[in-house]
């Protein structure tokens, strides 16, 4: 109830919460929604249509044009059931792995401190606020390795990461990171062994770009 006093609109996608793609949820404050017009037109969003005018509905159906993604909605419901079953375990597990990964990256930096053959600049929230994602820049012999190159080497080892601006180029400009960062995200299916695999791949980045 308290959140309703502060949020005009909120949305999320289920594909990042164990659900299917193509389905999400949008919360709108009632007064806020009445001042909005639909961006997608289709069946079910109108009250009346005249020859030269249209009258839209005033309820939430205004933003649900056409046939809904029925299978996606059913899948989203099952995702909610799964999240309720595991409760907070997924978040705590991901947070724990992020903490371990950050510490191991710091240890890696320390081991190469003298010759700087490999240096990792870490961008991550405090562990207490971290949800399992760690971003970083990679430097070999003092020169930055482009995040896309890092991701490519990781991919050869069957490690999937995100690389680039992460839909936040203005933030990257503010942080003076023109090439973006490599982002590692941990989830319920990851273990500490996966962290060790990432570290081994970083060693490969050093070997390839240190020649």
Annotated model-derived regions:
Residues 1-211:
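Pyridoxal 5′-phosphate
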């Amino acid at each position: 109830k308290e959140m309703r006093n502060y949020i005009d609109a909120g949305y999320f996608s289920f594909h990042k919460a164990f659900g299917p793609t193509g389905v999400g949820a949008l919360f709108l404050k009632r007064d806020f929604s009445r001042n909005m017009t639909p961006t997608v037109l289709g069946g079910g969003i109108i009250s009346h249509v005249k020859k030269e005018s249209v009258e839209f509905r005033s309820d939430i159906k205004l933003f649900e044009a056409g046939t809904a993604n029925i299978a996606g909605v059913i899948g989203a419901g099952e995702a909610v059931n799964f999240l309720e079953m595991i409760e907070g375990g997924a978040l705590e597990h991901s947070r724990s792995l992020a903490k371990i990964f950050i510490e191991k990256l710091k240890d890696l930096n320390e081991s190469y401190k003298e010759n700087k053959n490999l240096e990792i600049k870490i961008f991550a929230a405090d562990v207490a606020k971290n949800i399992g994602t760690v971003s970083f820049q990679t430097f070999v012999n003092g020169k930055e390795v482009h995040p896309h190159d890092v991701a490519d080497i990781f991919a050869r080892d069957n490690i999937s990461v995100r690389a680039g601006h992460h839909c936040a180029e203005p933030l990257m400009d503010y942080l003076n990171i023109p090439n973006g960062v490599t982002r590692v995200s941990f989830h319920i299916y990851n273990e500490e062994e996966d962290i060790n695999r990432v570290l081994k791949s970083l060693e490969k980045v050093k070997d390839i770009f240190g020649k």
